[in-house]
């Protein structure tokens, strides 16, 4: 299912309340700790051997912030998310050889971080809107693999 007008309204009304560094660090940390095989893409980040090391790693925080900031920019291009991510998709597929399932995994980790941030405001309706967005982003980033 694509992004509806209501999804877009919900996303636009809540995204600006986030701190990209905090949410990004938590989401990427969750990805790296929950799916430890994803750490192979981040060997330059240093010690990722414990939860404490992952969740307090400055490189994880910086890259998480970069990813979440990119999603914020993609929100401004919801009519052409595939076009917005075309170059990044190509880079992830041809240069980094990232498993495209990791984009969906990151979306799941980001959903958990958003739920922790928004608490009661993270209704099933808001969750669904973000899931639609993250699915569209994962699809766009996976486009370079086709």
Swiss-Prot record:
Q: Which keywords has UniProt assigned to this entry?
A: Heme, Iron, Metal-binding, Oxygen transport, Transport
Q: In which tissues is it expressed?
A: Red blood cells.
Gene Ontology biological process terms, A to Z: hydrogen peroxide catabolic process
Specify the domain of life of the species encoding this protein: Eukaryota
Keyword Heme listed? yes
Instruction: Domain (Globin): give its ranges.
Output: 2-146
Gene Ontology cellular component? blood microparticle; haptoglobin-hemoglobin complex; hemoglobin complex
Q: Which Gene3D superfamilies has this protein been placed in?
A: Globins (1.10.490.10)
Q: Which Pfam families match?
A: Globin
Subunit info here reads: Heterotetramer of two alpha chains and two beta chains.
PANTHER family for this protein: HEMOGLOBIN FAMILY MEMBER, HEMOGLOBIN SUBUNIT BETA-1
Q: Family assignment? A: Belongs to the globin family.
What protein am I looking at?
Hemoglobin subunit beta-1
UniProt organism field: Xenopus laevis
What gene codes for this chain?
A: hbb1
């Amino acid at each position: 299912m694509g992004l509806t007008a209501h999804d877009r309204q919900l996303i636009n009304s809540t995204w600006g309340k986030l701190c990209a560094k905090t949410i990004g660090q938590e989401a990427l940390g969750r990805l790296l700790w929950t799916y430890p095989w994803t750490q192979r893409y981040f060997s330059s980040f240093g010690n990722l051997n414990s939860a404490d090391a992952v969740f307090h790693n400055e490189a994880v925080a910086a890259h998480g912030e970069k990813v979440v900031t990119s999603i914020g920019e993609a929100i401004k291009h919801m009519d052409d998310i595939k076009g917005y991510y075309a170059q990044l998709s190509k880079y992830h597929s041809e240069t980094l050889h990232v498993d495209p399932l990791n984009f969906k995994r990151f979306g799941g980790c980001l959903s958990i971080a958003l739920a922790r941030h928004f608490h009661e405001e993270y209704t099933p309706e808001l969750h669904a809107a973000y899931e639609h967005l993250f699915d569209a982003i994962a699809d766009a980033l996976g486009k370079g693999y086709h």
